[in-house]
Regions:
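Structural recognition of the beta-strand scaffold that forms the well-ordered cores
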Residues: 28-33, 86-91, 157-161, 201-205, ...
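Bacterial signal peptide processing site
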Residues: 8-11
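N-terminal extension/subdomain marker
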Residues: 13-153, 618
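Residue-level signal for functionally critical sites in structured catalytic/ligand-binding pockets
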Residues: 39-41, 60-74, 163-167, 175-177, ...
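C-terminal motif of bacterial Sec signal peptides marking the signal peptidase cleavage site
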Residues: 4-6
């Protein structure tokens, strides 16, 4: 065998070897992981700690899964890449033996701690703090101060908050805290950062609803970029094998470029889509642009004319909403760009100021993406101007005092309305075949006129089952389509078909007609509906996605709780119904004599087989009517419209 070499080849090999072994710039990644019920109440989700039910260690938990993903990523890296990553995780805040208090661990410790698949029972931790409330400002400040020596050695610095998020109401719910409703408020977050004197290149939130201007307003002095979601997140959150790998493989990228890769990973990679759930949004923000945007919003609020409340209301209601819970009638936030564009159209006298704010907003949003269920999620949200959320939205939460004053005037103006909407019924008839029908986009239906002194918040067609001559069980709704004519709406004829949920075969198994109230349209033209239910006795908002052929293409449930002070705490978890689950829906029931609407629990359906969806004719007495509601909640109903059974 003859080997031929050349000096040039040897030089190339040596150069390549030097390139491969050359040290990479140091990157610090810190994770503040408040385990909460995402870690200690994994399955079954019932409010009881898993280890209490099992009377022993539980290897399940969303935090555990993500720590395992970090370990898996780290073990695939080269020695040079490992040397360049300085990873510190503060984890705890959950009702598990290994997660009580707080433990600080680097990657070497996490690898060692993972050997028995149970985190929190080793002796390798950098620090271990007993009886620590991770939802406190002091706990966060302590971790930030611990990081300071390492931060000084790193060229890129990232901090990730992990847990439930409530936008301007805070992040991180420690389930071992004296109050299980405790979160790190924005004020506490600011205090912790101010006391520690640290600064990050990227501050990220693997938590729901945190891509709000209110959050950005608090953290902008302490980070250059922010990565967060406007909407709720899937229960599994981020896929940390991919997250750490992206940091390691892109050691020379600045945070703006790396942040874009993280956004794309969240929307595109199969591991981030493994639950098949909807409502995925993620955005990268340049925090140096926060102050100019807030200044532009201050100028805008001075130009808004509250004498024209109806267009103001329409601008809000037509905007993309986030963090909705129907029974409490709340939403946390709306998309800021969507609202500004709607406002510009609805109130021309404020259009110049709105355009200036839009220009500033464009500079703030470096990169933003969403799935097809949130077509108008553009990267940054702001308080929704929902009157039921206003008691929790004060100066500590607001982006500025002028904005808070604007929000207060908006809520006050709409809340003083005492007049009900008026629904014109000249096109109604109690017999379907005698109705005066019109058409809209090729569909036959009713053309209605609905008016209100301060504007309509929502107008919908409501479908009902007649329990008797007095009570109507509302099983669903569709939004009424506004026509070009002033105050005119269109409603299609209902043929009496509706959703059917069955335990296995719909011909032989137990079944029920679930309530499904229209929520939104996807970019594919699919309809999303929501309802309230108990899934395995836990309160959830239940979502359905239906295609144009009325087939259910996806379903998911988001657990929530209501705190003692009235906060609706929406979980990051998204659940799917399966065999073995029990499901019990809440129906809105209308008392036609008392003319009141109340919520009542329906029958419980326990699935012995795989749940099956159908869309079929209802073999019961049924009717529909039209409903209009203003901002204050004053509601008008049309006459009841009988559906004739074929």
């Amino acid at each position: 065998v003859l080997f031929l070499t050349s000096c040039h080849a040897a030089e190339s090999v040596n150069a390549l070897s030097e390139s491969v072994s050359a040290p990479l710039p140091k990157t610090l990644i810190a994770v503040y992981m408040v385990g909460g019920n995402l870690e200690d109440d994994a399955k079954p989700r019932n409010g009881i700690p898993d280890e209490q039910e099992m009377e022993g260690p539980s290897l399940k938990g969303a935090g555990t899964d993500d720590l395992k993903e970090m370990v898996a990523a780290y073990q695939t890296l080269s020695s040079v890449q490992k040397e360049a990553l300085d990873i510190h995780v503060a984890f705890g805040g959950a009702r598990k033996a290994g997660w009580k208090g707080t433990k600080y661990a680097d990657m070497a410790c996490l690898v060692q701690d993972s050997q028995d698949q149970y985190f929190g029972n080793d002796h390798c931790y950098q620090q271990q703090i007993e009886n620590n409330n991770m939802s406190s400002s002091e706990s966060l400040a302590a971790f930030l101060k611990f990081l300071k020596p390492s931060l000084s050695q790193a060229e890129r610095k990232a901090l990730i908050f992990w847990d439930h998020g409530l936008s301007y109401l805070g992040v991180g719910q420690d389930s071992t805290a004296p109050s299980s409703d405790d979160f790190i408020t924005l004020t506490e977050m600011k205090s912790a950062f101010s006391a520690s004197g640290v600064h990050f290149d990227l501050m990220a939130f693997d938590a729901c609803l945190m891509a709000s201007l209110e959050v950005a307003r608090v953290i902008y002095p302490y980070a250059r970029y922010m990565l967060a979601s406007e909407e709720l997140e899937p229960g599994h959150g981020w896929y940390y094998t991919d997250v750490l790998t992206l940091f390691a493989q892109n050691a020379h990228l600045d945070m703006a470029a790396l942040g874009k890769k993280l956004v794309d990973s969240y929307l595109d990679t199969p591991q981030h889509n493994r639950s098949k759930n909807k409502y995925k949004t993620l955005s990268l923000l340049d925090l140096e642009q926060v102050s100019p945007l807030i200044a532009a919003l201050t100028g805008l609020t001075a130009q808004i004319n509250f004498q024209k409340f109806e267009p103001l209301l329409q601008a809000v209601e037509n905007s993309q909403h986030f963090g909705k819970e129907p029974q409490s009638d709340i939403s946390y936030s709306i998309d800021l760009k969507d609202w500004l564009q709607n406002l510009k159209q609805k109130q021309p006298e404020a259009s110049v100021a709105a355009e200036q704010a839009l220009s500033r907003l464009q500079s703030l949003v470096v990169y933003a993406r969403h799935d097809d269920s949130k077509p108008n999620a553009n990267g940054v949200s702001i308080y929704s101007l929902n009157k039921n959320m206003k008691p929790q939205y004060g100066l500590e939460q607001a982006v500025s005092e002028p904005w808070l004053n604007f929000a207060g005037t908006f809520v006050s103006t709409g809340s003083h309305d005492q007049e009900k909407p008026v629904i014109s019924t000249e096109n109604f008839s109690l017999q379907q075949n005698a109705a005066k029908l019109c058409s809209y986009q090729g569909r036959q239906g009713h053309c209605l006129k609905i008016q209100d002194n301060l504007g309509i918040r929502e107008a919908e067609q409501v479908f009902a089952l007649k329990a008797d001559s007095r009570y109507l069980f509302l099983i669903g709704s569709e939004v009424l389509h506004p026509l070009e004519q002033n105050s005119q709406y269109f409603a299609p004829v209902w043929n009496g078909e509706w959703l059917l949920l069955c335990d296995g075969n719909c011909q032989t198994g137990l079944s029920l007609f679930p309530p499904a109230y229209f929520e939104a349209l996807t970019t594919q033209g699919h309809r999303i509906y929501s309802s309230e239910a108990l899934l395995n006795d836990e309160k959830v908002v239940f979502y359905l996605e239906m295609d144009a052929n009325n087939r259910v293409v996806s379903q998911w449930a988001i657990p929530y709780s209501v705190s003692q002070d009235g906060r609706v705490i929406l979980s990051r978890t998204q659940l799917n119904i399966a065999a073995g689950d029990s499901l019990q829906f809440f129906y809105q029931v209308y008392d036609t004599q008392a003319q009141v609407l109340v919520w009542k629990k329906g029958s419980q359906l326990r699935f012995g087989q795989t749940p099956v969806w159908d869309f079929a004719q209802i073999n019961a007495s049924k009717a529909y009517f039209f409903q209009a509601q203003d901002y204050q909640g004053n509601t008008s109903l049309s006459p009841l419209y009988e559906v004739q059974t074929n």
